[in-house]
């Protein structure tokens, strides 16, 4: 088995059973194409989401190092920060979150509702900054201050996206391959590509398990030129950890994130409304709505490699719907 080295890494069991992989009949009829969805928005902690897969590995490493505090960073409405805070609460750890306001809004819902509200419920220590211009350095500086206060901090990068965290999505590729075996031959897989760990982990796993399936990352914050090296660097780092080769081409579409990260656009919001009305499934305006807009447009523009079944990776994010009201 090509991914046997995964078992060498300590991992906490937060998720348990595989998340559902479902056919979307009404959405498929609407688009004239077989569409399946991997429902990582229903992972069983803090309103779900993809970051829990990464945190299974990262939190295990934190405990191995004897940490009593998890430190991470993100936007005020970060799904990753929300899930990190929930994991810290579950494990009896302190959590410190370095937050920015990337869209510069003064809207009360954005500043206090959605993920930000949940951070308070998880008793998170909030540190605000003007901007996460160099998040790795800023997190290390914060960790130094926290350590000086007598804590034992463990730094988790933005999005949980380092080689260790991204192993969670190599593991997810295993899950997907097992669920598809004998049931459906997926032609294309679509995922939101942001901090790059989910995309890179899937790239490594699917290359070895479902090599005939193309993986397309729809960017949510950067151009292809800026995003490609982030994904490739992580892809290679993951492969090195697992003692594998990783030669699959990284495919990115950057036509759907304008006007910028965290700012809803019409195509993304239409995708959110469409899936809600047709399937009762909630996307979000920052990540999955824009990724689904890419899938929808990709079908109409014939951007996929063929007309076979498409799998959409639902990474979560529904709490942001409340933060972005009345835009949704």
Curated annotation (Swiss-Prot):
Catalytic activity: D-cysteine + H2O = hydrogen sulfide + pyruvate + NH4(+) + H(+)
BP GO annotations: D-amino acid metabolic process
Molecular function per GO: D-cysteine desulfhydrase activity
EC number(s) stated in the UniProt entry for this protein: 4.4.1.15
Location of N6-(pyridoxal phosphate)lysine modifications: 51
Cofactor: pyridoxal 5'-phosphate
Enzyme class at the top of the EC tree: lyase
Record's keyword terms, sorted: Lyase, Pyridoxal phosphate
Pfam families with a match to the protein in the record: PALP
Family membership: Belongs to the ACC deaminase/D-cysteine desulfhydrase family.
Subunit structure: Homodimer.
Function noted in UniProt: Catalyzes the alpha,beta-elimination reaction of D-cysteine and of several D-cysteine derivatives. It could be a defense mechanism against D-cysteine.
NCBIfam families on file: ACC_deam_rel (TIGR01275), PRK03910.1-1 (NF003029), PRK03910.1-3 (NF003030), PRK03910.1-5 (NF003032)
Family matches, as PANTHER family: 1-AMINOCYCLOPROPANE-1-CARBOXYLATE DEAMINASE-RELATED
Name of this chain's protein: D-cysteine desulfhydrase
Species: Shigella flexneri
Gene coding for it: dcyD
């Amino acid at each position: 088995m090509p991914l046997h080295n995964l078992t060498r890494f300590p991992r906490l069991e937060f998720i348990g059973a595989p998340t559902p992989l479902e056919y979307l009949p009404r959405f498929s009829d609407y688009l004239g194409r077989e569409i399946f969805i991997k429902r990582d928005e229903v992972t069983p902690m803090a309103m779900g989401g993809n970051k829990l897969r990464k945190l299974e590995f990262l939190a295990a490493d934190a405990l191995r190092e004897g940490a009593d505090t998890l430190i991470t960073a993100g936007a005020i409405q970060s799904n990753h920060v929300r899930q990190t805070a929930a994991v810290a609460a579950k494990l009896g750890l302190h959590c410190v979150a370095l937050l920015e306001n990337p869209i510069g809004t003064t809207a009360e819902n954005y500043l206090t509702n959605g993920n930000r509200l949940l951070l308070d419920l998880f008793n998170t220590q909030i540190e605000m900054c003007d901007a996460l211009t160099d998040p790795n350095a800023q997190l290390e500086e914060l960790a130094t201050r926290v350590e000086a206060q007598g804590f034992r901090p463990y730094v988790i990068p933005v999005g949980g996206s380092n080689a260790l965290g991204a192993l969670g999505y190599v593991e997810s590729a295993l899950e997907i391959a097992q669920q598809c075996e004998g049931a459906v031959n997926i032609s294309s897989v679509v995922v939101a590509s942001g901090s790059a760990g989910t995309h890179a982990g899937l790239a490594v796993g699917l290359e070895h398990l479902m090599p005939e399936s193309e993986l397309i990352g729809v960017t949510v914050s950067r151009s292809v030129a800026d995003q490609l090296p982030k994904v490739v660097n992580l892809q290679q780092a993951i492969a090195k950890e697992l003692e594998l080769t990783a030669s699959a081409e990284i495919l990115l579409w950057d036509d759907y994130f304008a006007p910028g990260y965290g700012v809803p656009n019409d195509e993304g919001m239409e995708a959110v409304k469409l899936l809600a009305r047709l399937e009762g499934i909630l996307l979000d305006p920052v990540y999955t709505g824009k990724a689904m807009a890419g899938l929808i447009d990709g079908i109409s523009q014939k951007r996929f490699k063929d007309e076979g079944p498409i799998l959409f990776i639902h990474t979560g994010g529904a709490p942001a719907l409340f933060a972005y009201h009345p835009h949704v």
